[in-house]
Amino acid sequence: MDVQRLLSTAAWVVGGIVTYELVRSAFVSRLARRMDRAGSDYVSSRNIRLDRYKFASRSYVKQEVLNSPDLAKAIDASAAEQGKPVEKIRADVDSWLDEIVPAFNTWAFYRFGFSIARLALNFAFEVIIDRRALERVQKKIPSDAAVVYVFNHRSNADFIIASYALASSIAISYAVGEWARVWPLDSLFRRFGAYFVRRGFRNPLYHLVLSRYVQLIVRRGVSQGVFPEGGLTRDGALREPKLGILEYVASLKADPTFQKDVVFVPVGINYDRVLEDTSLIAEAKGGGSLGKDTLASRLATGWAILRKMPSMLVVNSLRAAA
């Protein structure tokens, strides 16, 4: 009798779990479809151009990168050099690609991210965007060209401002560092179309993988945003450029199979006052430092926005020129 009761209870528990999973799966699938439809409707109603390759599955993009002939040779060479099995090196490459490749979602970018950015930026700043100059430049760009928007780097808020300013015409993809590889930021940034990079990681094979990914999305027409300074300016003057990603893009022109134009659009972001002003002044006087670009520094920037909202007026002028 006890055995029968135990079996009956177990059957009810299993049945309950199965029912819950079926209902949950159906609900999640329906919600995902509704969110995708809402994002697509938003983009269509505003005639926003989205790069098709952004919607390719992550597994497909990863496989395209892995299909690079020189990458396969480099994996074999790295295994021989390190005395490790080829499978171990391939596993490392797969892990890096998992970090790098995004999973763009229109609802996440336009209905969630854009709405939050608009609320925060317009509440904190007076945002001035030279849309005429931007539209004038974009009209001159060939429809099949690969476009790279090149920004100066004045503040930790630049990433938000750049995406917000261009969102009415294009959703750009750009690299983000290790600071964003924490939950839930990693999932959010992937859905915003950002790809993750390991700054300061010296492994040559990793940089080959990253370069092949960047070159792949350029070949497929994905519009990118690049901050060549690689870090905030300390005094308002442009820093010496770090040409990593720009070099990956420019080197494609040496490939005879690549026939597209690559258009670099310089975009200026200027402030009356940056969020990090107090820290920058202290650093200039030798009494402090902004330190490395970390999640903590980004959170500090967010706190600065909240703390200064009642009194700070910032004019951001974004201008583009061919």
Model-derived segments and their meaning:
Residues D2-V148, S155-I161, D186-S187, R191-G193, ...:
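Membrane-anchoring hydrophobic helices of lipid-metabolizing enzymes
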Residues D158-S173:
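Classical protein tyrosine phosphatase
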Residues I172, G177-A194, R202-A322:
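A cross-family acyltransferase "interaction/gating" segment
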